[in-house]
């Protein structure tokens, strides 16, 4: 049984956040989504707090449980718990509405929409 345990991937459970002159931990379970803008990565919590993270979205994808987080596009990585609804968009794409609301449209590309629907229905 210990061999099986060792082979199971361990996913990140928290982040150390620097805010002003304070440090605190943020549980991954409190995260609604991550987004990238101007070469910075931001984390938005379920209670609508926003912090800068020192991780690229690609790195986060490797460290977070793929059953919980989905890379919707180059700019966003969303938690299944934050998704409020999905609407069809042009050319086979979809728009994802999250809580707390994101300032832009979160668009899932035509290439990812099938995988996204499978992921949501898991």
What would you call each of these model-derived segments?
Residues 2, 6-122:
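Basic, polyanion-interacting recognition surfaces, primarily
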């Amino acid at each position: 049984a210990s061999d099986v345990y060792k082979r199971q991937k361990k996913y990140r459970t928290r982040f150390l956040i620097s805010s002003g002159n304070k440090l605190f931990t943020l549980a991954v379970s409190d995260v609604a989504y991550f987004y990238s803008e101007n070469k910075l990565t931001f984390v938005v919590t379920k209670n609508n707090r926003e912090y800068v993270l020192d991780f690229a979205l690609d790195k986060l994808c490797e460290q977070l449980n793929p059953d919980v987080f989905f890379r919707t596009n180059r700019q966003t990585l969303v938690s299944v718990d934050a998704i409020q609804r999905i609407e069809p968009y042009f050319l086979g794409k979809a728009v994802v509405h999250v809580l707390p609301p994101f300032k832009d449209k979160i668009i899932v590309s035509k290439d990812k929409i099938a995988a996204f629907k499978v992921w949501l229905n898991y």
